[in-house]
Regions:
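Non-catalytic propeptide/linker segments at domain boundaries
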Residues: 3-105
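A short, glycine/acidic-enriched catalytic loop
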Residues: 178-213
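Extracytoplasmic
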Residues: 99-101, 165-168, 195-199, 255
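Active-site-adjacent mobile loop/cap segments within catalytic or ligand-binding domains
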Residues: 240-271
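Short glycine-rich His-centered loop
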Residues: 102-114
Length: 271
């Protein structure tokens, strides 16, 4: 048996941090420097212990709503019919390709390990190469502790939105933490173009009317569904079902705010 350690539900954001970074903190050197860990390109995290590779399939049953070749796991009181109708609607924004103004912000509320910063940097570099003006923030939001990390990252995102009102999408890039009851780590994996690859899971929050205030959750859900349809359609097995739940994660700040779990704490960086 295994236990998936989902992040704890977030309540209303805490007070903003007293000191907000004024500039993007860039990694030094070439991205290739970060794609080969010191222990070797296929090395697992040094503290990983026993690793169990596992492919997480798309779901079926009353809790799952089909989304193209993918699916959405509904952990809310919203009906399946309501969700299915909502994700059929168009996106509430349009990305302006080749715009001189930033369209996307990639950031990390927690887990600013060198691996996840490298992953976020590849995401940003790939979008920029495709003509989508993207910024990457590497602020250490969970230092000195996890407590307050989302308040800190909220202040950072608000600063970017004030400086660059053209930003339509905010991607909070993380890795998941999945462990068995015995403490072994699971590595969510699939095969893409012949290479073992970390699976991806999108988390989209929902307003619960009290502690989780997300008036724009429907628009964010449409965006999550568009990602799921595209990714799973292009690369079958690449995604885990979208997790639609009462989570906050500062997703009230735009209509394109999502948390992206890229692999887990058992995956290696190449995956």
């Amino acid at each position: 048996a295994s236990v998936q350690a989902d992040p704890a539900p977030e309540s209303a954001p805490e007070a903003a941090a007293s000191s907000v970074p004024q500039t993007v903190q860039a990694l030094t050197g070439s991205i290739e420097d970060y794609l080969v860990p010191l222990l070797g390109e296929d090395a697992r995290p040094a503290d990983a212990g026993s690793i169990l590779e596992k492919n997480y399939p798309q779901g079926s049953g009353e809790k799952y709503i089909p989304c193209g070749a993918g699916s959405i796991k509904n952990n809310t009181r919203q009906t399946a019919a309501d969700i299915a109708a909502e994700i059929a609607n168009p996106l509430p924004f349009a990305i302006d390709p080749n715009s001189p103004d930033p369209q996307v912000l990639v950031m990390h509320s927690t887990d600013r390990s060198i691996n996840m910063c490298a992953v976020g940097r590849v995401v940003a570099d790939t979008l920029n190469a495709a003509g989508i003006n993207t910024l990457h923030d590497e602020t250490l939001n969970d230092y000195p502790s996890y407590t307050g990390s989302y308040a800190n990252s909220r202040a950072v995102v608000q600063q970017y939105l004030a400086q660059y009102p053209s930003i339509k999408v905010v991607l909070d890039v993380h890795r998941d933490a999945i462990e068995s009851e015995s403490g072994s780590r699971y590595a969510p994996v699939c095969t893409v173009e012949g290479r073992q690859t970390a699976q991806v899971m999108i988390i989209c929050g929902c307003d619960n009317g009290t502690t989780v205030q997300l008036p724009n959750w429907r628009q964010n859900l449409r965006f999550a569904a568009a990602w799921e349809r595209s990714m799973e359609g292009m690369y079958p097995g690449f995604t885990r079902p979208v997790l639609f739940s009462y989570r906050f994660y500062n997703q009230d700040l735009t209509t394109g705010s999502l948390l992206i779990e890229i692999g887990g704490h058992g995956n290696n960086l190449n995956e």
